[in-house]
């Protein structure tokens, strides 16, 4: 039995560490013969009943623990683990396609990235890895006195380049397999696990010909040689390997119907795979962060915002121009106005508010593009980025942002662009509330906007049944009109399907959440959670530190989302004076964490650090 700086209990004795102040005091009253050593006190079981001194020592044990040399780190670890559990639960059994740039694979952080992937795999996340090879191919060519040739986004693959591509892909595959093979620490398994598993390999890695390719051919007079395009992803085999517990390693070498080996673009392979298998996320691990014009990390972009940023640079960026060509010129008009970071959305009257991914993601017909070759991307299975523009970084990470917007429009709801030179960036992005990279999302704040006068009828229709049941306080049309500026609505197909209100109390730095309501036929789709998250981000952007609410029927729903019951005295006085005590409402409050990924109340398209 070991001592860990806290009480250790066995069937016969209870030891209290001598350094505990209460234990030191009690130690003076212990007979000399019973003083086992100067570091601990032996208290026999009879004393372990209701001795006031011992009870005090037991009550103070965690106070003592807080002062321990190593226990500050322990407390932080426990706090982090508790904060991470919702994400652990949410990510389990999800499928992530991860592309790792050649710069990261060639750098000092490669081992840590792969170690984190192995860890996440054992937590139940399914991975398809698509490693980049551009850096390694160029290095091999340089060693042989050859210069790489790029035209647009693609490499011109002559015989020397193809040989280098084969060598680079093979070496990287072997390296990744080796890095994922070690199991966990034998010491930890012996201490907490099954010793029969001491010599098992860590992660099973499956690689092979998981996609078919075709030659790019001659384009605008340029013969691209053995450069390939993705023709078809073998979805069934990939899913079979993932379901069997393997990590799938998808190299950028494709095979044609005539048996040729073709060098394909890594991002085209990754994006095509993510779309074909219906991945939950595409994660791009790069050699740097996505920054705005002020040098601040861009933490979050809606699909509409990412699309807008890429389109604005179509005149100066060939990759951005190819994105516009791939997705069409008219796509942007079908979006709502930018959410920006302010929540002050102004939506055109003719906006059809159904989910962006429903409207812009025709069914993926593997092998013939989208919509049987007649859809938005009939000529491409994925979106290629590369060439001199990407290597030079003249436009930063615009090329990766274009790829992110492309797959979001195709149906992948979340894309994460991560700086692979940050140790643990994958864990920080997936398990921290604010993340550590840039997330592009097609499903966040879908249709959310500030309420307008013409929304009154829709809001009334949603809240009326809840008012009649007593779940919400009745509001007259005049009261609803006066409070309209505080309401947020969700619009779909021209109809209001959900609403909520935030009433700020700036002096007390808190706000009231009220009138959260979802149309009966839209419940169970997460609309309430989206509204609450939107309200929380807006409150944080307004400088508020707490949210409170009054409820009679929905306490459980709010408790599960971090609210705790509080006394009426914690409600701002100005609000307490207007409370109808006859409703016997319960009062709940939630402390807001600083949210750097939230919205800004400034009515401009900008990003806050």
UniProtKB/Swiss-Prot annotation:
It catalyses: L-glutamate + acetyl-CoA = N-acetyl-L-glutamate + CoA + H(+). Its main location: plastid. Pathway: Amino-acid biosynthesis; L-arginine biosynthesis; N(2)-acetyl-L-ornithine from L-glutamate: step 1/4. SUPFAM superfamilies: Acyl-CoA N-acyltransferases (Nat), Carbamate kinase-like. It is an enzyme of class 2 (transferase). It comes from the Eukaryota. One of its GO terms (cellular component) is chloroplast. Keywords: Acyltransferase, Amino-acid biosynthesis, Arginine biosynthesis, Chloroplast, Plastid, Transferase, Transit peptide. InterPro entries: AceGlu_kinase-like_sf (IPR036393), Acyl_CoA_acyltransferase (IPR016181), Asp/Glu/Uridylate_kinase (IPR001048), GNAT_dom (IPR000182), NAGS_kin (IPR033719), NH2A_AcTrfase (IPR010167). Residues 446-594 form the N-acetyltransferase domain. Residues 1-67 form a transit peptide. It is found in: Plastid, Chloroplast. Transmembrane segments: none annotated. Its EC number is 2.3.1.1. Belongs to the acetyltransferase family. ArgA subfamily. N-acetylglutamate synthase involved in arginine biosynthesis. This is Probable amino-acid acetyltransferase NAGS1, chloroplastic. The gene is NAGS1.
